[in-house]
């Protein structure tokens, strides 16, 4: 397109200028006759700000048709130029530059990009809007930023990219997912996941989306921007727009990388000698013989004598490869444009028999049927396979080091110690099991855009979004569990179908240059169906076909069949008004009717309003040259959470079986929960104040946000008198509050000829507090807490509740007169929190699990074709429970039956104050108090070094761009959490450290 327009400029009396996504055309000023005398030829090079030559740039004698375009190296040579002429240099996407014909600057012309931050166009839901006109709190993340993190989880790619968004890895195994919180937790039982909208289609998960298909991602954080999605938007909204076709010659992009994954940790397990000493001490403290022949039974004694200990961590965990390949083809003409994306992702697991693969294909088409009528489609299909090792991760690495993995003939041993302590070889069960799942997603979206008049348009949007998950497991005839049933297989399939149809009307009108008005009206119907089928069978002739032979099982369990649906009828009205390009107003009302609500509360109403003032456009700041942007934003509104389980308002029945002779009669009776016809949505009402600022032509820019959110009518299960015939009822009673501050700062400290240095910061602080649970109070009128769910009025929702570790009792302590008079030296000392000289349930304390604040620091350097970037992620505060320090399964109870984290435990000769005395027969009392650790951490998430080859060098190979890069991901972590990752319990699959080599090429 650029080359064509450049040629037209040279050969006609027209000029072209691009602003945002609009190309304007105009007629040149009246031509002047080129004087035949005193003319010359001017030569030079046209480059961008990075020194890259611009191919096809327009070089024109102003006011004439005498012009030329630059060659493949950005060079030009323009003849017949008069001494007093002005040379005009232009290229679409760059600011036009004018230079006198006698200037020395002609030798090298540098064009600046014509893309200020304020003119960025972002998606706001049911339309787009210039960044400068936005009144709500919206964060944007580019595709390049997302793809800087090597992961199959789009949520993990989003971590640290937007203030107000907290991402935690729920499962780092291949194909694992992440939890995303936007501005804190807002529901006790209705879910806290945001709503995802992909090309206008709602989705419950984005892990099936190929990140390379994404053009932009927006996070809607305040009620004014969220309210257009009504009863589903209380936890925030993430809008994803995928790449579309473009007019002009075909563009082919290929992106690939290969990566090596490995574990990292900040703790050590006991080695063989240390574990043997621990076991002896545990026997001694249990008043058992700690002679070697008594302590080390079975194979343990042989290994102890030989010193050939097993390092289970090294045996079970190894480096693993990960690769990704993406192809994107974009093209189009005057009528039809298309984008075709194909992707393949493959991640091997670091433990045996685990891995994840995904194939994806996306096709987006836009076709102009008539001058004012466009149709299009978005098509997505993904298929993924996930393989999971049998057993939990902690069972792999906490086997005793005094063990034998293999028999003398090289075959696997089943019991690695033969000590009678159920030390089953983890490799054994992996060999005799098969656990796989397959996920298929199909999304088809059709739309029609009709430009009825200059100001009025209509869009019809219909979509089908289906997802099918097949989950299969098999425990073979030799598996330690499966052998009890001569093999056991399970097979389950879940189906979800999401149907959406929308009618959208837009009206846009400019009343002279000072008044801009636009209105959007929408009506939609959304139906979601979910089905789940499950079956299990036992008794197999052999293990050859694993779960595929479930049809030939000898016995079957009771099949399961579940189904549910949701229906949503919605209406939306939104009005935006721009006065003098300085005063911006937005008003919206969404109405949702949901099938899951009670019959007395079928419809929810969610209004919002917002105002923004572009202060820098005021006359009193027009001359403030250092100030490039200053905008104040205010918003207030309500959004909902329809987290009601389908049919909950109607009441559920329980199945009962009755025997009549040789027949079984199935019947149904009302369940234990009373129906509630008043059941409705949870409502979050939120106010937001934001300040956008920019200095030095955008070299310093950022945003400060403060919000205050009150969520009412939270769903809780309330106990009711049994005299009613029921025990519980789900009601809208609880209340919660969130408030916080968010800061985003982007700076360019250095910007010179060939060198650029950028630094960016984000800061997020959220305070969450439960204000009310079920309305019940004690005899003093104090609200009652829900200890079972760990919900406490006046505290955050996500907490631990336990005793406080205060050291280890020593021989010289006056134990008899203490608050724990029955304790013994070497046992755990608890803190007497209320100072009543005894340990009771009242000494337990509430510990916040979520961080107090999170932040990022990023920097990037660009020198000619080289670039270097780094991102630091900080999570401060919060608590994590570490079972490696407390439980038997994780070797933390100091009974010396399994291996665990090396501890400085108490002995007669080592009166430690860190961990109690080991005991073979009894775990230390109150040992759970040892498991709570400060969850703060600092992590170097990504370091990337890359090189972009000069266009002049690669253009001969028909390349537009070529980039090679290396990335170190999760390379360094500083934390006190003794685990493989500061956000995971040690039994979870570890988050890997990754070394990556990648290539991006465009033709």
Describe the predicted segments one by one.
Residues 1-362, 367-370, 374-382, 415, ...:
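Short, small/polar-rich motifs associated with maturation and membrane association
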Residues 301-303, 594, 875-964, 968:
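Extracytoplasmic gating/loop element in the C-terminal half of outer-membrane beta-barrel translocons
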Residues 100, 146-151, 193, 199, ...:
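Extracellular/periplasmic, surface-exposed regions of secreted and cell-surface proteins
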Residues 253-305, 534, 731, 748-849, ...:
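Conserved small-residue
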Residues 155-159, 733-737, 779-800, 846-856, ...:
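C-terminal extracellular loops and terminal segments
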Residues 268-270, 475-477, 535-539, 776-778, ...:
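Short Gly/aromatic-enriched secondary-structure transition segments
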Residues 131-132, 228-230, 248-249, 263-265, ...:
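Switch/connector loops and helix/strand junctions flanking conserved nucleotide-binding motifs
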Residues 849-881:
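Glycine-rich, aromatic-lined ligand/substrate-binding cores of catalytic
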């Amino acid at each position: 397109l650029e080359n064509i327009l450049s040629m037209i400029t040279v050969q006609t009396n027209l000029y072209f200028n691009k602003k945002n996504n609009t190309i304007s055309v105009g007629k040149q000023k009246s031509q002047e006759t080129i004087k035949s005398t005193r003319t010359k030829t001017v030569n030079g090079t046209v480059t961008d700000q990075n020194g890259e030559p611009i191919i096809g740039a327009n070089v024109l004698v102003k006011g004439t048709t005498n012009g030329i375009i630059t060659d493949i190296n950005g060079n030009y040579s323009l003849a017949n130029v008069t001494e007093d002429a002005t040379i005009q240099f232009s290229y679409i996407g760059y600011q036009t530059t004018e230079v006198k014909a006698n200037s020395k600057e002609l030798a090298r012309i540098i064009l600046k990009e014509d893309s200020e931050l304020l003119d960025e166009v972002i998606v706001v839901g049911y339309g787009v809007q210039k960044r400068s006109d936005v009144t709500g709190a919206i964060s944007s993340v580019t595709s390049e930023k997302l793809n800087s993190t090597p992961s199959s989880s789009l949520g993990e790619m989003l971590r640290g990219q937007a203030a107000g968004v907290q991402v935690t890895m729920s499962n780092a195994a291949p194909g694992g997912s992440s939890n995303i919180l936007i501005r804190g937790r807002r529901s006790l039982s209705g879910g806290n996941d945001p709503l995802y909208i992909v090309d206008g289609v709602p989705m419950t998960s984005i892990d099936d989306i190929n990140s390379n298909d994404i053009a932009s991602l927006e996070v809607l954080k305040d009620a004014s921007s969220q309210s257009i999605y009504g009863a589903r938007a209380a936890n925030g909204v993430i809008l994803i727009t995928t790449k579309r076709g473009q007019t002009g010659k075909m563009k082919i992009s290929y992106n690939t990388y290969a990566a090596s994954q490995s574990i990292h940790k900040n703790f050590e397990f006991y080695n063989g000698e240390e574990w043997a000493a621990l076991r002896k001490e545990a026997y001694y403290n249990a008043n058992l013989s700690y002679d070697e022949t008594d302590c080390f039974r079975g194979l343990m004694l042989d290994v102890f004598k030989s010193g050939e200990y097993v390092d289970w961590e090294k045996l079970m965990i190894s480096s693993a490869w990960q690769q990704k390949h993406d192809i994107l083809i974009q093209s189009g003409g005057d009528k039809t444009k298309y984008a075709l994306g194909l992707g393949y992702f493959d991640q091997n697991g670091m433990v045996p028999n685990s891995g994840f693969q995904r194939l994806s294909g996306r096709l987006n088409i836009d076709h102009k049927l008539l001058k004012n009528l466009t149709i299009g489609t978005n098509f997505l299909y993904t298929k993924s396979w996930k393989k999971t090792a049998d057993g939990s991760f902690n069972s792999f690495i906490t086997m005793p080091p005094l063990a034998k993995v293999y028999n003398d003939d090289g075959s696997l041993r089943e019991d690695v110690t033969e000590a009678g302590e159920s030390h089953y070889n983890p490799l054994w069960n992996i060999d005799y099991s098969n656990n796989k799942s397959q996920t298929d997603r199909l999304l088809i979206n059709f739309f029609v855009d009709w430009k009825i008049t200059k100001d009025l348009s209509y869009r019809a949007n219909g979509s089908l979004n289906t997802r099918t998950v097949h989950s299969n497991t098999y425990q073979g005839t030799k598996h330690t569990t499966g052998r009890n049933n001569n093999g056991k297989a399970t097979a389950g399939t879940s189906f979800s179908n999401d149907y959406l149809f929308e009618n959208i009307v837009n009206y846009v009108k400019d009343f002279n240059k000072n008044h801009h008005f636009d209105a959007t009206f929408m009506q939609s119907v959304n139906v979601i169906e979910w089905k789940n089928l499950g079956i299990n069978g036992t008794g197999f002739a052999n293990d050859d076909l694993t779960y595929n032979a479930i049809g030939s099982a000898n016995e079957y369990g009771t099949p399961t069949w579940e189904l549910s649906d949701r229906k949503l009828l919605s209406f939306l009205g939104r009005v935006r008004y721009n006065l003098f390009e300085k005063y911006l107003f937005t008003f919206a009302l969404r109405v949702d009717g949901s099938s899951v609500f009670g019959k007395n509360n079928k419809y929810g109403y969610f209004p919002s309003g917002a105002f923004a003032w572009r202060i820098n456009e005021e006359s009193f700041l027009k001359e403030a040259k250092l100030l490039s942007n200053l905008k104040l934003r205010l918003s207030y509104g309500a959004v909902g959470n329809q987290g009601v389980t389908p049919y909950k308002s109607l009441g559920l029945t329980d199945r009962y079986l009755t025997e009549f002779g040789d027949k079984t009669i199935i019947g149904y009776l009302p369940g234990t929960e009373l129906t509630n016809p008043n059941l409705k949505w949870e409502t979050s009402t939120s106010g937001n104040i934001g300040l956008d600022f920019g200095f030095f032509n955008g070299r310093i820019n950022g945003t400060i946000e403060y919000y205050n959110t009150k969520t009412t009518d939270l769903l809780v299960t309330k106990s009711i008198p049994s005299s009613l015939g029921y025990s519980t009822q789900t009601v809208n009673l609880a209340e919660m509050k969130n408030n916080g501050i968010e800061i985003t700062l982007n700076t360019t400290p250095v910007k010179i000829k060939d060198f650029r240095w950028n630094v960016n910061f984000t800061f997020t602080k959220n305070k969450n507090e439960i204000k009310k649970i079920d309305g019940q109070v004690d005899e003093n009128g104090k609200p009652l807490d829900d200890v079972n769910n760990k919900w406490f009025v006046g505290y955050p929702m996500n907490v631990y509740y336990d005793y406080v570790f205060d050291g280890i009792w020593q021989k010289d302590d006056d134990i008899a007169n203490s608050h724990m008079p029955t304790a013994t030296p070497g046992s755990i000392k608890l803190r007497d929190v209320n100072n009543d000289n005894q340990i009771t349930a009242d000494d337990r304390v509430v510990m916040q699990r979520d961080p107090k604040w999170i932040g990022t620091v990023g920097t990037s350097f660009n020198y000619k074709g080289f670039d270097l970037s780094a991102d630091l992620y900080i999570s401060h505060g919060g608590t994590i429970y570490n079972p490696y320090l407390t439980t038997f399964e994780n070797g933390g109870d100091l009974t010396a039956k399994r291996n665990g984290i090396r501890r400085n435990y108490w002995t007669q000769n080592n009166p430690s104050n860190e961990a109690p005395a080991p005991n073979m027969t009894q775990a230390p009392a109150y040992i759970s108090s040892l498991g709570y650790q400060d969850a703060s951490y600092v992590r170097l998430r990504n370091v990337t070094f890359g090189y972009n080859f000069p266009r002049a060098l690669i253009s001969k190979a028909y390349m537009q761009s070529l980039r090679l890069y290396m990335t170190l991901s999760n390379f360094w972590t500083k934390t006190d959490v003794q685990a493989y990752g500061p956000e995971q319990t040690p039994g979870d699959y570890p988050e890997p450290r990754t070394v990556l080599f990648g290539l991006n090429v465009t033709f």
